Amino acid sequence: MRNHLNLHLDRGFQVGPPSHIDSDTMATVKQVQVTFDCTNPRAVAEFWKAVLGYVDPPIPPGFDSWDAYEASLPVESRGSSWACQDPDGIGPRLYFQRVPEVKTVKNRLHLDVRVGAGLTGDERVSALEAEAARLGPLGARRLHLLPADEENEACLVMQDVEGNEFCLD
């Protein structure tokens, strides 16, 4: 069985039956940022920018480019992080931070790239495969197709340029 927790921009979270939440004590989430541990933050950010149509955040005040900003940092801090964001401000910001270790196990969290929403059967699989073909030259790796079952439509499991799993859904 595979179940995904999906954040849909038009419907909010979908997980099980609703429970009572006291709105007086509930925190109000203003934004969501997804953070990736990686060895090359800029390369992973460039990959996800191409996948999602995201852009770099605004250049910090006082600098004419991100490269100029990076050059102003201490040597040990250069290249330690990068980010990208939805140009429309709707999707979550993605943040990439350098860590010394490489990925060794399956992700506990992954992104679903919703390219087949509303499609079923062969039409859905064709859309997933077409997107996988587009992402291959960017450094993505196709792992396997999870066929449709009684609970879920088909999805395609992929890896980004550093081996982080994601699904074409």
Report each predicted region and the residues it spans:
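Glycine-centered loop/turn motif at secondary-structure junctions
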Residues: 1, 52-53, 136-140
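N-terminal amphipathic/basic-hydrophobic helices that include classical n-h-c signal peptides
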Residues: 1-25
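Acidic (Asp/Glu-rich) sequence patches and key acidic residues
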Residues: 16, 46, 50, 54-56, ...
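Vicinal oxygen chelate
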Residues: 20-22, 27-36, 58-59, 68-73, ...
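Hydrophobic ligand-binding cavity/cleft-lining segments
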Residues: 27, 39-49
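Short, conserved charged micro-motifs
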Residues: 43-44, 119-127
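Hydrophobic small-molecule pocket/channel-lining residues, especially in calycin-type beta-barrels
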Residues: 77
